[in-house]
A protein has these predicted regions:
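Catalytic cores of DNA base-excision repair glycosylases
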Residues: 2-222
Length: 223
């Protein structure tokens, strides 16, 4: 059964890497900002941009609402696509103020599936960003899918590499209990495994999932 298989993969990843304690942030709002900044870049660049925001006193809904877009763009330059991302941050904060009075607590107080639909209507927020905000900032039981997820579970033969976001997400949402801590840890472990082994050019040596992996089986020499 797929539910038991997904739990087995989780257990193997957890045994290999231990608890990940993700998302690294001091506040839920910092998580939201990081979820937008991490689009099309690596986490190291996001950390530099967030540190800049902290130094400039800009890591709050009020500050991001009031800061000029050009100053914001320069502040988040390390995250890449800084002009685009400054607009996306402004759009998110504009939504937060217009719809929820600038309060994340109020935003997260409602039904989370409806909130997901609202977030997806904000320019620049796609499914991965919306689910990251909901799971990591709002403690809502939604599963985050990213390139690492697709690559790993395609290698395991569970999905096709071209399977769409919602279909992959549904696989986890349907076959795992709606547990925030489980979803949080599972996604973080997938990312960690993707960095170490299940890369675009796989590093199969030492991979704890090699017995399940089609990629490893294809590359293994014939007996």
């Amino acid at each position: 059964m797929l539910d038991a298989y997904l739990v087995e993969i989780f257990d193997l990843l957890h045994a290999a890497y231990g608890p990940r304690h993700w998302w690294p942030a001091e506040t839920p709002f910092e998580v939201c900002v990081g979820a937008i900044l991490t689009q099309n870049t690596n986490w190291g660049n996001v950390e530099k941009a967030i540190n800049n925001l902290k130094k400039e006193g800009l890591l709050s809904p009020e500050a991001l609402r009031d800061v000029p877009a050009d100053r914001l763009a320069e502040t988040i330059r390390p995250a890449g696509y800084f002009n685009v991302k400054s607009v996306r941050l402004k759009d998110f904060v504009g939504y937060l103020w217009e719809r929820h009075g600038g309060s994340l607590e109020r935003m997260f107080a409602g039904e989370w599936r409806q909130l997901r639909e609202e977030l997806l209507r904000v320019r620049g927020i796609g499914p991965e960003t919306a689910d990251s905000i909901l799971l990591y900032a709002g403690d809502k039981p939604t599963f985050v899918v990213d390139a690492y997820t697709r690559r790993l579970f395609a290698a395991l033969g569970v999905v096709d590499p071209e399977t769409g976001y919602e279909e992959v997400r549904s696989l986890f949402m349907t076959n795992l209990p709606p547990d925030v801590r489980l979803f949080n840890e599972y996604h973080a472990l997938i990312v960690e495994h993707g960095k170490h082994h299940c890369r675009k050019r796989p590093r199969c040596d030492g991979c704890g999932l090699h017995l399940f992996c089609r990629t490893h089986a294809a590359e293994r020499p014939a007996p």
